[in-house]
Amino acid sequence: MQKNLVIVESPAKAKTIEKFLGKDFKVLSSYGHIRDLKKKEFSIDVEKNFTPSYEIPADKKALVSTLKTEAKEAETVWLASDEDREGEAIAWHLYEVLKLKPENTKRIVFHEITKSAILKAIEQPRDIDLNLVNAQQARRILDRIVGFELSPVLWRKVKPALSAGRVQSVAVRLIVEREREIHAFQTEAAYRITAVFLVPDTDGKLVEMKAELARRIKTKEEAKAFLNACQGASFAIDDITTRPVKKTPPAPFTTSTLQQEAARKLGYTVAQTMMLAQRLYESGFITYMRTDSVNLSEFATTGSKDAIIKMMGDRYVHLRHFETKTKGAQEAHEAIRPTYMENQSVEGTAQEKKLYDLIWKRTIASQMADAELEKTTATITISGSSDVFTAIGEVIKFDGFLRVYRESYDDDNEQEDESHLLPPLKKGQKLEHGPIIATERFTQRPPRYTEASLVRKLEELGIGRPSTYAPTISTIQQREYVEKGNKDGEERQFNVMTLKDCQIKDENHTEITGAEKAKLFPTDTGTVVNDFLTEYFPDILDFNFTASVEKEFDEIAEGEVKWTSIMKNFYDKFHPSVENTLAIKTEHKVGERILGEEPGTGKTVSVKIGRFGPVVQIGTVEDEEKPRFAQMKKGQSMETITLEEALELFKLPRTLGEYEGKSVSVGVGRFGPYVLHNKVYVSLPKTLDPMEITLEEAEQLILEKRQKETERHIKKFEEEPELEILNGRYGPYITYKGSNYKIPKDIVPQDLSLASCLELIKLQDEKGPATTKKGRFAKKK
């Protein structure tokens, strides 16, 4: 009989832990949850105190059977799933499904995968915490109620196949509201006045000192008048203040701050950061990655101290204890940190190494001395004016934690990173001025959310928890309520007036403004669903209500309230509002917007959500003639499209002429404008407008596509039509029966025979599964 069976969540973790525990322990993985609510059913008996109905998915039945057999043969079963609510629920489901007995079942937890942590956990087992299980179950059931009851409402009122989630809907609302703020924003112009003064340095050599007027000037006329007044004015130092400034290091990483900083510094998505952090954790390199605690253990602070002294000396050490300030912080474990502070780097992929380096630096910096700076401010008066210029100098006297780590910001161009020292100055000193420049600047609209800034906003509002941020952001994109994308900037003119050598030079310049990268945009479907839910289910979309539900989950976890009473209070209000909304008859289809009338016919022109997305419609179902529909162009929005733009869409598709005896037309589809010839679609580049493209330009695009296709197909074999040698993005490869196979670099693809191809396929199949045509990163089922 096997003495001990340890069950963890992931196979990677199982391998690592088995090495620590020795021959008396067998470690197996549950591969996450082994059962869940039934997928196609409501699975909750409301009448019986919200009793859930769980099932073991088909792909987990063989695994569960294996675990049952192993559990029966073991003297003791150790449930070692993660130390959060989700992990506690996994342990409880294992206990129930495997029919374990309390006398030979032990629950153990650890927040780092090291030998000492695992052995300590074995020495300190506990029971399954049913309060944590109930908190997870309450979240799961509440989310099922919302999703299962709201989705049919959306199918009937908005569009088939839509779905709604509790936290996801609030996240979409934030993005929709930000988009509307941006469209409503009115840019205001003002002039920023800067001056260069020539001041002698310690060697008597004139150096430039930059200063800025303490206020912005509203109009060009005022700015010009100010420059004119400066022509005959004298300038002098009125006051000089020097004060010490200290900068304190940021706290160690929580889940959300790691997601934010990895996005800003490394360009990682929220999901990517969590995947890499999971790997680092399972390899034993970092502590548990789902936490809202900023606390460090004594082991970590001592390790940090030793590493700092060894690398930089005693002066750089300042041990700190950080307090968690997040609303409803629930996790008892530590911040995310390296398991051993002396390990400045680890083995792994390039991405894993970069993330580890970020975590190590942030943790070390948190236990380092403040940076000490000296800030000097000089006020410069202008004769005959109450206005003053201000020159600011800042110099680092002691770098402290900045030697290791500098925090990033969402808008890095707002951050002055260079320290500079002002030249020697004294009160009353007369100054000679160089150029004085008035530059027209504009107020900036609110920025769209990035994944990282959305996480920060959700955390500020107390919505979601460390385990829910990444799934929430992934889900709203998968449902196509939100899309991540880039926006090209627009050209804008601005005015610059320069006073130099007693003359004012007036010039207009151009700049590109408003360019954005990897930002979250609401789709038309997302906007319509948001507006519908906000109108008919205001509680679900209310930030405070959603945060209060999170607080109730925390109270369940603490054992302060019964989870069933929370469910009842919610359901008794929510369910009637669902039934009432289903009964309401609306005059127009939800989300429909009337743009005006078609000239000549007087028919109504509108935009609405159609079966395949947003469409423009001319006419109504009540008219004698059937309505006409046109798909909107990529980049057009239901909220902003004009009548003129809508009518233009009905000019497409248009026929350009014939090429090689076949018709050539241009149109717009779901993925943008295209040319169609002989059943072959060719995408239009951004430089060509579908309303203006000529037949000759279309012919060129057709020929270019053919050339690319010719270059792509290297070799085919008549005797094996399913096998082909192709040229891909990463070089030549063999495709065969839905799988792709690499061709070694030292082989010329054109020289390969069918037998050689089949031999390469056989060799690679023996090593492991080939890449499918779905792509390297296709989800495993």
Where are these regions (language model features)?
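Short active-site loop/helix that positions an aromatic residue
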Residues: 16-20, 92-93, 172-179, 361
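C-terminal or mid-to-C-terminal helical accessory/interaction module adjacent to the motor/catalytic core
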Residues: 113-197, 242-246
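A conserved hydrophobic secondary-structure block that centers on an alpha-helix together
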Residues: 259-261, 265-272
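Intrinsically disordered, low-complexity regulatory segments
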Residues: 1-141, 149-150, 214, 409-413, ...
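Short acidic, hydrophobic short linear motifs in intrinsically disordered regions
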Residues: 237-241, 248-262, 287-291, 445-457, ...
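Metal- or metallocofactor-binding catalytic centers and their adjacent structured scaffolds
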Residues: 217-252, 426-432, 439, 544, ...
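Basic, low-complexity terminal or inter-domain segments flanking catalytic cores
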Residues: 2-5, 16, 25, 151, ...
